Amino acid sequence: VVFDFDCTLAGRVQAGVEILNILAEEFGFQKLPPEDLAHARDLSTRGLMRQLGIPRMKLHRISKRGTEEMSKRMTDIQPFHDILVIVRQLHAAGFRLGILTSNSEPNVTAFLQQYDLQLFDFIKSSSKLLGKGSVIRKMLKEFQLKPSDVLFVGDEMRDVEAAQETGIHMAAVTWGYNSHASIQ
């Protein structure tokens, strides 16, 4: 079972919006007002980029700065719902557990240590926000996983699309970034 990190294991929607708005000032794109969050949850990553005027060629730098900002807030980030119980039950049942994230490995490790969740067999970190399918393929190869044996748990349209593209099973949570309607 491979989990996405941000907004699936770790609850950071609000922190993510705050950081996005800090980066908007720094990189010159539109802020996301809190009253627009519900609408934004219905958009794909590319759709949100278009709406806010985020240029693709700056995406890597913006993502890197976002990860830096997130590292300052990691001790304030809480796990989502009953995810701690679920992860512990899966581990106790003998499932191999992994994390696939665009966040940094040090941020993820700090979170796992804070909540005594060092139960994961691997953390695969990639700064690539778009093209998650290629990251999944690399993960499958690196950790010698068969697509038919993998369940990916995520919260975004891009997670669903990447799972379909790579032939892995997908479970979408509804408490994360994208709305229930958008990930069906």
Residues of each region from the PLM?
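Acidic, Mg2+-coordinating phosphoryl-transfer loop and its flanking beta/alpha structural elements
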Residues: 151-184
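A short, structured active-site edge motif that brings together acidic residues
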Residues: 36-37, 117-130
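N-terminal helical cap/lid subdomain that shapes the substrate entry/recognition surface
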Residues: 1-84, 93
